[in-house]
Each structure stands twice: as C-alpha cells, then as structure tokens.
C-alpha cells in the first residue's frame, strides 16, 4: 500500500454480508471515518442466508439487518445505499457510479458477491423483455418480499388467486430450503434438478437418494436429470417430456462470482477475482476482493463463513498488518429447513481418504466421514445430526482421532445409564451430599431412620426418590442385618 | 446452643451449634435459604475443632535454613511491623501489599481495607474474590448500575417458570440450593442447565445443553437472535426500562442457530428448543456461575445473558430476572467493603472524590492521604518481588498457591518477596512458604456478619472460645496498626507514619470488637450503593438476615429493580458484546479443552475440608470421555498426565460419559489443577481464565 494507513480512503463496493463484516472490522480498528460503502440494494446490509427462514416464517424480515443505518453514521462510515458502481478507474483511483459521480479511493474492496445463474428456459423472459410473473429469483430481500407478497396477498390465505403449487429449479442447498419453506406454508412443491441426485455438489449419490426419499415423504416430488426447457401457459416443460403444471417457478440454480467490474478494470478473473493471501488483486496493490466474488488459491466459495474470515483478515491488512494472511477455510454447510437435516463438512465428493459410512435408507439417514491421517477432512450427515456439534469441532480443529473414533462418532450415542435402582450394589453412592451408600440405606427401616442415622436426603434432596425406592424394595428380613451394620461402621 | 451459619459457601446455610463435651455438634435450623438442609460439608463443619493440625502459636521461618520456630505474638507482630516499616521507608508505601479473601467476615474485609489504606498507606490490596464472581459483578454494574449477586431471594427460584443455569453445578457446589430447583419442577416449571459436563445439576434439567468450554457467550447471542426473529422480545419493557437495545438486536443478526452450533458444538435444534421455552414463559430467571464467568471474556458472557433477560423484560419483575450465584461464603460482602483494589466501603469507587471524602471522614483521616486504585488480584501477584512490584505481602483468608491460576509462576513470585506473612488456622500450602505465620480463629470461635449470595446480611456467632494462643484476624490487624503508629492519632511503635490528619478528627481507631466495627462499617456505607446503615446485629437475629440496600429506617430490599435500576436515568443498559473466544485455543500439541471445577465434599483449596476426617479426600482426578480414553489409551482408575503450556499434573483417570469428548476436567481443590490453568485476564473484571485452556492428555 502506497498511502499511509492513517488517512487512506477505503471504498467498499457491495453491501452484502462480507462487506458488513469488513466494516465492523474496520470500525473496531478505528478506520470507520475513512470508509465508504457503496451498496446496490436499498436495504442496509442484512443476513442474506436467513432469507429462506423469512420465507418459511420462522424469522421476521426486520430481524435480518446486521446493523442499523444509524450505527454506520455514528461511527463515521459513509454508507451509500442504492448506489450502483459501473466502473473502477484504476488510473485515477476512483470508482464511478451509475449517476456518473466518482468516489476516490486509496484502497478499493470488491465485495460484489455472486449473481444468480438464469437457466436457459424459454418463456421466462417474455417478448417485451419483462420476466414472466410466475417466475421468481431468490437472492435478495426484495426477491423474498415479492415472493411473500405473492404467497399471502393482504394476508388472505383463502384468496383463490394465491399460488397453490411451485416448481423449484435447482436441487442444491438453496433449492431444498426454498422448497421446504414453501411446503411449510402449504404450497405443493416440486424440484427439478439437472444432475442425477440432489445436493450433487455436496453429497454422493446414495446420500442424494436418501434425500430424495425424505423429500417424497414430505410431499415434494423430485425430478432428477431433468432440465426445464420452456415455460408455457400449460406449465413448465422438462426435457424428459414432463409438463409440470404450476403457479410459481422459483429459480435457485446456483450462482457465479460477480466479477464484471473487475473484468472491465482489466483485473485477472478466472472463476472469480484472483487474489493473494492478503485478499489483494494480483494485478493492483490497491484493489482487494472478498467473499463470493473472490478467487483465492483457485477456490471460490459460496459460503458466508469463509467470506467473514476473509473480511477479518482484510480488516487487519487495511489497518496495516501485512502479516495477516488468509489461508483458506473449512466450509461447513448446514441446511436450514424444517424436517430436513443436512450438514456437509468440506467437500466429501472431492476429498480423498478412508471413508466411514453408516446409512439406513429406511430411516432416511446417511452419515459419512472422510478420514485422512486420523483427521476428519470431509463429511456429510443426512437425516441424522447426532453429535453434529462434536463432529464439526473435530473437523474444524483437525483433531487427530483414535483408530475407531470416526466410526463411533457416527454410531448412535449410548443411551443414558438408566440403571435400575434396586440393582444398585451396596457400595454404590446414593446420596452424594452426605456420602451414603445403598447398603447403608438398605440397613435403615424408614425415611426418618435414614435421615437420623445417615443424613441422606438432608442436603440437596435429590436422592429422596432413590432412597424411598431402596427402602421399599429392601429385603424384608429380620430387624437389622449385621453385615450391613458393620459395613456402615467402616464407611463413616 | 448457638444459632449461626455454615463456614463454607455463599448459601450460608443456617445451623445450630451445641457443645457436647469437648466437641461441637451441628444441628439443623430453619433458615429460608436451606430450610434445615445441609450438605456433608456443613454437617461435618465442626470437625476442624480440636484438629491436631490447628496452629496455636505464631511461627517464624528462618530464611537461611528454612526452619520454623515458635514465637510469641509480640515477637511475631514486632517482627512483621518493623519489616513493613523498613520496606516502606526504602521503597515507598506501595511496597507493602495485602491479599484478602471472600471468606472473611464483613468486619474483617472492612478492617483490612482500612488497614491497607490508612495504616500501610498502600494502594496494593486485592482479594481472591476476583477469581470468584468478579465478571458477574462487572456485568451487573454495567447493566444495572449495581452488583448484588441475586437481586431476589434464592427461594424465588421455586416460583419462576423457566430457570436457566449457565455454568452452575449448584447440586454439588451448594447442594441445599438444588431443593429450590426440585420444587420449581414440582410446581410445573422448567430447568435449563448449560455446562460442558452433565453434572448432578444437569441431571435435574428439562433441557441440558453441553457447549464447548468458553462458548456460553455465542449461545446467548444465538438465543437472543431467535427471540428477536420470532418477535418474542418485550418491546414495551425495552422502551420503558432500558437503553441500547437496537445495537444489541442488530449484533445478534449474525448469530443464527447453525452458526452458533458450529462455534459452540450445541446442536441448532437444542438452541431452538431453549429459545422457544423462553419465548413462551411468563417468568424467566437466568442465573450464571463460575462456568460462565471465569473466562477472559467472562464479563461479556454475563452481559450477553443479561441481554437475554432484559430483552424478555425480566429484571425487576417478581420471580424473574438475572442473578449470579456467588461462590465464596462472603463473596458478596467481601467485595463491598474495601478489600478490592478499586473500592471503598459501601461499594463506593476509590476514584470518586465524594466517596473518598465520606469514607475518610469516618476513618478520621484526610481524604488526600487515601491511596488510589491498586492492582487487581492476579496482576498484584504477578508483580510481587519484581522491581516495580511490592516486596511484602500479607495474606488473610486465602490459599494462593492452590487457588491462583498459573500457580507455578505465582509461587515463584511469592518466593521473590522480602516478606510473606500468612494469617491462617492451619499450615496451608501458602502458609508453608511464609516468613511469618499467624494462627487465627476459625468460624465457630468468632462473631461477624457475612452477606450471602442473595445480598442478605447474616450473623455468625461465636459458639466456643478459641484455643489458647489463637487470635482473630481483627486482633492481628489492630496489633499491626498499633505498631505501625496510627492509634488514636498518636504515633507509637516502629515508624511514625507521615500522615497529615485533619485537625479535630480523632484519627483512625482499630477496634477488635466485631459489633463495634460493624457500627463503623454502617457509617462508612451510609449513602453508598451497598448501604448497611440501617442494619444492626439485633435486626439480623430477629429477621433471619437483612437485605441491602438498607438505609436507616428501611426494612431492607429483598427484591431490587421493581421501580428503577441504579443508573442515573433509572434504566438498565443493553451492552453490545462480541465473541472473541477463549484466549488459548487447542493446537496440534494441545488438542483438548481443559476445564476445572469442584467436588461436593471439598471446599476451595481444601485447607479446611481436607483436614476434616469425615470428608473423603480422594485427591484430584482427570475426568474424560470413553471416546477420548480410547484415543489416548487411558483406563478408569489408572493415572494419566494432563499437560498445558504452563505445567503438567498426574492423577487417576475417571472415564465418564457425562463430559464432552473434546474436554477434560480436573477439580481444583488439590495442588495441580491451577498449575495448568491460563492467566489470561478479562479486560474489565480482571478475572483469570480458569475455566478453559488448551491441554493434552496421555496415559
């Protein structure tokens, strides 16, 4: 960086989750007043990944904003909403907005995210260039709001004009989430996926099969290896000859890094904008990129956690710490949808290693870990998330596991002890507060006797049920058993 | 027959002592906190009476030979006072330091603070309460403007709807308190327990969450996220009684359940279950304890849970709110009366000119002569014997070398002192390193007030006379003060202290009578946050204790915040906190989390309980999960070694399914555990991170 860190102007293009996290990092380092955010949407940065939760109804839309507008202002951050950047002029170190105004920078950060892919379906775009009103994308808060309006016009659920069915194009994480969200709202949903199984980028074919079966149980028909080709008045036509009658088509078929600005500015773009370990463009030391639009170490990610980690590193870099470096990130993808449990660790489709796998297609579960040198390097848990927290910790921290541990992690947890009280051996402790064994209780005749001679039940009171049961089941022998009495003598 | 209270934890259970020949016998007594119940520590509390290990004469150690010899009290006190005076002459007043304890009575804590500031003129005084509930204290002060552990009686637990215990194992650490949980459940309420170990408390839970140690904070953020997403926050309460919610509300937008799951290891579904339990409850009580508080981000963790309670509109509502389950017997009172580096009696701040003027007037000295803020407990110990640090330390009611974090280092600091003086009843591990050990009375032999976890001031009464040769801490303080030359404003003894005294004021006095000192304490606290001025020994006896604040003429305050919080605007504050994570994260060499805690039959460093023959003293152990045991080849009962970057210890393995497989647990009552713990400090409370560090285990 040529400028002194102290008064450099930092311009962030984009107002998504990566940009918001970067701003927080800059503010924490006192760089707020030097920061300008140019956001295309009219909403303050919000938590995009919860859009399907809003659609499903578990989250109110207002809960998604990551910071209030005032928060930015109070910290000196110049947040400009509704600001579309059309060009980066690297020669003059300015960015140009759609209204032709220019904003100078010393460091510019591209956090432009991804652009949803529009599958080539004829009839989606009508002759006049507008989108067919049945078709909805699902990437932004506005998309979500439109969809919600369609679904629940004036809150009249019985309105005959409301859609009753929907086809989701794309059987990835987002497609499944949207499908579940709509189904929870009572819409009949179908999924069209071009590949041969669901979640094909994340899980293998057998896990995909389990998922398809689960979706069917939940009432969602899935069409695999099928492409939507045409939207007509009769419905959505697939290349396998089917026509799906539908009121709504939601496009969730993935996205690609949004790198047009970088291309126009003649920065190196492969799949994404190519950056080094400091998230700096390999062409220009004053240009950076983070999040979905960036390509680091030949990898583009579509997930928020690496984007946030990149934002954290870049905040350090922009604050002058050139030793800060992004070294890649382990991705954990978690499906957020009612009655559908999926967790994907890393890239189980691509990682090599020993595979430990337990599946029960009847129960709809498929659990798999890829283990290399004792470490979990990837995995997919479908339909059964037991120990997901523990498995994720072992994956994130690259813990070296024992020989059989990966397998044990996949097995059901041994059920809680539930030991039958009457079987307690005489030396088992029943009352921890007073340190009283089952034998000493059995040697007593009544609860009062227990209280007076052993003080069991006089502390936390938690052993009272066990004591009662022991007294009730004590062998109804002659008054007091001499052996038990002497036992008592030795323990006190 | 003497009505008194248990010598141990912050419940201060009521009990009656009666003399049976040479022995003292404990019997039950009705008191609202414990209703006659006691744990085995309480039942056996009189067991130290007549112990052969009891010290009955001052001991002086020869530095050259390490040999101990008995001394008379005059010899010992003369020796200590003259050394203190000499050191002060050479290095200045701050060279002499004082370390107190949360087990000392209010009168002792008060007198100790006064002794440090007036007789020694030092700013260097702090106490082991920093290692107890200081994070909750700091959070309470920030959110409510005041810190009283529980702002309601403990028995209120029975009448709430959902009680959330964050990092508390009260069924083992304060067993009689668990009765209130059981009764809550009998009444149809729910108990939630959050702990890396499924403890006897967790076994009582309707919902048990088992997070990675050090992640209680993101759990709270996740709960608030879900409450806000569902529209379950109390907007009216927030608008009328609080400030700062908008920033907090926005900050939790980044903590959706699956994100929390990844960080905390708690499944998203469980977090949802907790949020829905809270959203649908009329009354919610959130209680934190050491598990949540003893972290380098302990204050922030408590604040995050406080934010949950505030967002639900609970604090100030009857049978609801937030509270801290203080640990030590007088953890509450101990922090209110001036043995903390930044405070004067009545929970007054030492840098507040009005507070200084008030307290100085009670003490009969010029406010100008009062020193300012000193080092916090760990920082004080860390500085001992260093060029800038104190050269002497007087220890009352604390067994530092067992209870301090990074104990090997702390022990080396003690070794570099010119003078270490320990007042204790037995030759504790810390006393064994001292130059002078002063034998002092124990609980049943002395009278004084304690303030329990509810902010209830209670009275312990002497039941027996102390053994010959034993004196009270109050006698030690008075004896040293007299020798240091400030009795009744007249310079006597070793070193006339260069103190300007206000004309017309009598100068400081050094009573040894607890009730007399309490009367002075009442005056010193008058008008402070922790106002005791309306409390008398007689009232305490008659009313089963009195809750502060209790200005003269007041009935006391069992339940706080019904109308106002203690900030100037009367509102509670939401405080936006971020999760940074534990200071020390697992690495390839130290791949596990280590956490520490207690067992039922022992108390603190065990100086008392390990000497009571009726309490099992099984020594330390290492709790680990069968998955981990398999991984490292450990077998139940066989020794394993636990290592951290600071030290190692060996103890038998206890293989249990109740602990997280990525975590090991060691109890801290025995030497060893704290050789392992991390001394990273909370930026606000200066609490060390006892509850999590990176560790390795090998068989």
Set out the residue ranges of the language-model regions.
Chain A
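Mid-to-C-terminal Rossmann-like scaffold of FAD/NAD(P)H-dependent oxidoreductases
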Residues: 5-9, 28, 293-389, 416-438, ...
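A Rossmann-like FAD-binding core segment of flavoenzymes
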Residues: 32-34, 73-96, 103, 184-277, ...
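Local cysteine-cluster metal-coordination motifs and their immediate loop/turn environment
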Residues: 427-441, 452-472
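FAD-site-proximal beta/loop scaffold in flavoenzymes
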Residues: 130-158, 234-237, 242-309, 400, ...
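Beta1-alpha1 glycine-rich phosphate/pyrophosphate-binding loop at the start
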Residues: 2-78, 176-202
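FAD-binding core/adjacent interface of flavoenzyme oxidoreductases
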Residues: 2-11, 66-165, 237-240, 248-252, ...
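Glycine-rich Rossmann-fold phosphate-binding loop(s) that bind the pyrophosphate
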Residues: 14-17, 139-140, 169-172
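Rossmann-like dinucleotide-binding cores of NAD(P)H-dependent redox enzymes
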Residues: 65, 162-167, 173-229, 307, ...
């Amino acid at each position: 960086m040529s400028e002194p860190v102290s008064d450099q102007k930092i311009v962030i293009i984009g107002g998504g989750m990566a940009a918001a996290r970067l701003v927080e990092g800059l503010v924490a380092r006192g760089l707020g007043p030097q920061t300008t955010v140019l956001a295309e949407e009219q909403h303050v940065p919000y938590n995009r990944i919860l859009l399907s939760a809003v659609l499903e109804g578990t989250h109110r839309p207002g809960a998604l904003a990551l910071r209030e507008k005032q928060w930015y202002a109070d910290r000196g951050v110049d947040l400009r909403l509704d600001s579309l950047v059309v060009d980066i002029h690297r020669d003059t170190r300015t960015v140009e907005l759609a209204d032709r105004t220019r904003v100078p920078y010393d460091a510019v950060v591209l956090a432009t995210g991804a652009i949803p892919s529009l599958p080539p379906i004829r009839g989606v775009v009508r002759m006049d260039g507008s989108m067919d009103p049945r078709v909805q994308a699902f990437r932004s808060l506005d998309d979500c709001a439109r969809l919600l309006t369609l679904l629940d016009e004036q809150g009249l659920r019985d309105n005959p004009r409301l859609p009753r069915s929907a086809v989701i194009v794309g059987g990835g994480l987002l497609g499944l989430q949207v499908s579940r969200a709509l189904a929870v709202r009572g819409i009949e949903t179908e999924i069209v996926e071009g590949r041969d199984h669901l979640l094909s980028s994340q899980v293998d074919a057998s896990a995909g099969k389990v998922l398809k079966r689960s979706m069917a149980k939940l009432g969602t028909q899935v069409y695999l290896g099928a492409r939507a080709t045409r939207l007509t008045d009769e419905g959505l036509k697939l290349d396998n000859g089917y026509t799906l009658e539908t009121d709504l088509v939601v496009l969730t078929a993935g996205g690609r890094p949004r790198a047009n600005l970088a291309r126009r500015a003649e920065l190196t773009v492969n799949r994404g904008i190519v950056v080094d370990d400091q998230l700096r463009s390999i062409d220009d030391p004053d240009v950076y990129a983070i999040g979905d639009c960036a390509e680091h170490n030949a990898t583009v990610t579509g997930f928020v956690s690496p984007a946030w980690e990149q934002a954290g590193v870049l905040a350090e870099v922009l604050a002058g710490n050139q030793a800060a470096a992004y070294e890649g990130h382990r991705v954990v993808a978690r499906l957020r949808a009612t009655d559908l449990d999926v967790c994907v660790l890393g890239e189980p489709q691509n990682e090599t290693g020993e595979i430990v796998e337990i599946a029960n297609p009847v129960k709809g579960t498929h659990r798999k870990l890829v283990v290399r040198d004792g470490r979990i390097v990837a995995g997919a848990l479908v339909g059964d998330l037991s120990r997901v927290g523990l498995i994720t910790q072992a994956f994130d921290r690259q813990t070296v596991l024992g020989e059989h541990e990966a397998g044990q992690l996949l097995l059901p947890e041994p059920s809680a002890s539930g030991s039958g009280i009457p079987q307690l051996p005489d030396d088992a402790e029943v009352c921890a507060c007073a340190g009283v064994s089952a034998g000493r209780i059995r040697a007593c005749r009544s609860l009062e006797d227990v209280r007076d001679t052993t003080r069991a039940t006089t502390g936390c009171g938690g052993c009272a049920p066990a004591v009662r049961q022991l007294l009730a089941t004590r062998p109804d022998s002659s008054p007091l058993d001499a052996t038990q009495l002497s036992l008592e003598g030795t323990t006190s | 027959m003497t009505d008194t209270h248990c010598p141990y934890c912050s419940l201060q259970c009521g009990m009656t002592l009666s003399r049976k020949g040479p022995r003292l016998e404990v019997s039950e007594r009705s008191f609202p906190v414990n209703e006659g119940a006691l744990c085995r520590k309480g039942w056996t509390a009189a067991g130290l009476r007549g112990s052969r290990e009891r010290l009955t004469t001052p001991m002086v150690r020869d530095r050259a030979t390490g040999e101990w010899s008995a001394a008379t009290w005059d010899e010992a006190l003369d020796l200590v006072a003259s050394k203190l005076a000499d050191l002060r002459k050479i290095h200045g007043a701050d060279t002499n330091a004082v370390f107190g304890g949360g087990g000392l009575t209010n009168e002792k804590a008060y007198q100790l603070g006064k002794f440090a500031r007036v007789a020694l003129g030092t700013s260097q005084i702090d106490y082991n309460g920093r290692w107890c509930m200081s994070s909750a204290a700091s959070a309470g002060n920030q959110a409510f403007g005041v810190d009283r552990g529980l702002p309601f009686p403990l028995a209120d637990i029975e009448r709430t709807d959902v009680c959330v215990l964050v990092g508390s194992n009260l069924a083992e650490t304060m067993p009689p308190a668990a009765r209130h949980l059981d009764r809550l459940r009998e009444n149809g309420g729910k108990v939630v327990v959050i702990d890396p170990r499924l403890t006897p408390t967790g076994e009582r839970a309707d919902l048990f969450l088992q997070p990675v140690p050090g992640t209680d904070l993101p759990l709270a953020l996740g709960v608030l996220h879900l409450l806000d997403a569902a529209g379950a926050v109390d907007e009216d309460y927030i608008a009328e009684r609080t400030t700062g919610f908008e920033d907090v509300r926005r900050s939790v937008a980044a903590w959706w359940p699956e994100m929390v799951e990844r960080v905390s290891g708690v499944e998203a579904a469980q977090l949802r279950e907790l949020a829905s339990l809270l959203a649908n409850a009329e009354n919610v009580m959130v209680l934190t304890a050491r598990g949540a508080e003893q972290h380098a981000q302990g204050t922030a963790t408590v604040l995050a849970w406080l934010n949950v309670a505030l967002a639900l509109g609970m604090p100030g509502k009857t049978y609801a709110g937030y509270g801290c389950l203080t640990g030590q017997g007088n953890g509450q009172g101990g922090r209110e009366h001036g043995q903390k580096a930044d405070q004067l009696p009545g929970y007054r701040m030492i840098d507040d000119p009005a507070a200084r003027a008030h307290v100085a007037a009670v003490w009969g000295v010029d406010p100008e002569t009062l020193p300012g803020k000193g080092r916090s407990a760990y920082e004080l110990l860390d500085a001992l014997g260093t060029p800038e640090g104190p050269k002497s330390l007087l220890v009352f009611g604390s067994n530092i070398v067992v209870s301090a974090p990074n104990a090997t280092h702390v022990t080396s600091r003690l070794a570099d002192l010119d003078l270490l003086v320990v007042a204790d009843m037995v030759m504790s591990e810390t006393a064994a390193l001292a130059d002078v050990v002063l034998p002092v009375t124990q609980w049943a032999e002395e009278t004084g007030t304690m303030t329990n976890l509810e902010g209830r001031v209670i009275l312990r009464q002497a039941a027996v006379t102390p053994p010959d040769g034993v004196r009270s801490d109050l006698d030690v303080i008075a004896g040293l003060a007299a020798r240091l030359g400030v009795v009744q404003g007249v310079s006597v003894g070793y070193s006339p202290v260069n103190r300007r005294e206000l004309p017309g004021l009598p100068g400081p006095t050094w009573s040894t009578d607890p009730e007399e000192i309490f009367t002075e304490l009442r005056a010193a606290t008058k008008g402070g946050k922790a106002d005791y001025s309306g409390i008398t020994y007689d009232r305490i006896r008659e009313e089963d204790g009195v809750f502060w604040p209790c200005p003269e003429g007041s009935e006391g305050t069992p339940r706080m915040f019904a109308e106002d919080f203690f900030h100037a605007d009367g509102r509670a504050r939401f405080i936006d906190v971020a999760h940074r994570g534990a200071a020390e994260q697992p690495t390839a060499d130290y791949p596990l989390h280590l956490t520490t805690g207690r067992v039922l039959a022992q108390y603190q460093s065990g100086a008392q309980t390990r000497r009571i023959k009726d309490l099992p003293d099984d020594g330390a152990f290492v709790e680990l999960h069968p998955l981990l045991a398999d991984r490292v080849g450990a077998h139940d009962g066989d020794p394993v070694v636990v290592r951290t970057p600071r030290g190692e210890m060996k103890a038998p393995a206890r293989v249990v399914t109740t602990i997280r497989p990525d975590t090991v647990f060691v109890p801290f009552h025995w030497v060893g555990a704290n050789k392992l713990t991390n001394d990273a400090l909370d930026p606000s409370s200066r609490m060390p991170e006892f509850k999590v560090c990176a560790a390795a285990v090998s068989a």
